[in-house]
Amino acid sequence: MLDIAVADAPIRDYATERLVMDLRQLTPNLAVSPQIDLPDVALLARSGFKTLINNRPDDEDGAIDHQLMAQAAADAGMEYHYLPLRPGQITPDLIHGFSVALDGPKPAIAFCRSGNRSTVLWALGQAGKLSEAEVLNTASQAGYDLSGVVPLMRSLAGASR
């Protein structure tokens, strides 16, 4: 069991090393989050996360350079994937890369500015595997409205048949 508490705003309790962030569980092996700070990476690893997926482009306001994140992940013993998704620029390579990252060590934590783009990549990777209702419900329970990507999900689900 991961020692994680969910909060409205990311905070850290360094005295007990208990991670308290806005982590949202999508599956037993995947949580998504808004921007993760460098010190959080080691805490995530100590909390049990094995893979870190960064969906935030370096040039986005407030983003931490992906090379610094990669080093923090390596120092913490985590697998790291940099899959930057700019709003509205979803590609088959990003969807595939996200799915491949999820096949790595588990559990994984994926982040972007709000967690929405990470959730979108997960959802699109589930097209044809889970029902549309299951995907939308899972995202909704985590606080994300994916109605805008339903047409793409349907297209991908049809292509996977």
Predicted regions and their residues:
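Cys-dependent protein tyrosine phosphatase-like superfamily
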Residues: L2-I109, A123-R161
